[in-house]
Amino acid sequence: MLILNLPSETIGSEMYELLTMANQTTEDVFSLLDNLLKWTKSQIGKLNVVYQDIDVVEVVDGVIDIFNMVAGMKKITIREEKPEKLAVSADIDMLKTVVRNLISNAIKFSNENSEVLVKLEAKDGMAVVSVQDHGCGIDEEGQKKLLHTDTHFSTFGTNNEEGSGLGLLLCQDFVVKNGGKLWFTSKKGEGSIFSFSVPLKK
């Protein structure tokens, strides 16, 4: 929402806060519906993997550009550690969806005035992308439920943003379809690191 780029003094602090909340709600609803549509298509076999040569660094840079304003609303800095290029053969739309969900979640569950670190590297024939936040983290009980289709897991971000858990299931599904895997580590009260891998281009 372009109006949120204006200083709060220009439109008044109360109106600015209302617009910020409306913007966040709209983005959350759109993200949920988008994930739901893709998940449904994937589960009924209507979503095929279209392999093409991709630079993961380019994909991640593009997603970060989109989320910088959202992160700025919570005074969160997104920092990257990356090589110049990381070539893979994968479905670009699926890859973008995975990166978008992981960065969105990191911002959602980060504390204000903190940093989200996005790290890219080549390791054992795989391109590995890790997204680390310094936020609320996930307790052990929640970790057991995460990434399982037979258990419902939802939680709230540091500004009470709702998380359905569907986005991570979709990420896992898309990563596996592209020959990789998704994993995470988390500690309650300290934050989480979500990582995924896809095969490097041969």
How should each PLM-predicted stretch be described?
Residues V50-D65, K96:
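A conserved beta-strand-to-alpha-helix junction within the catalytic ATP-binding
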Residues Y16, V50-D55, G72, T77-L86:
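Conserved catalytic submotifs in the C-terminal HATPase_c
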Residues V56, G137-H148:
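Short helix N-cap motif at coil->helix boundaries in the Bergerat
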Residues A106-I107:
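Short helix-loop "hinge" at the ATP-lid/N-box region of the Bergerat-fold HATPase_c
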Residues A22-V29:
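Short alpha-helical segment of the dimerization/phosphotransfer core of two-component systems
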Residues T40-Y51:
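Helix-loop junction within the histidine kinase core
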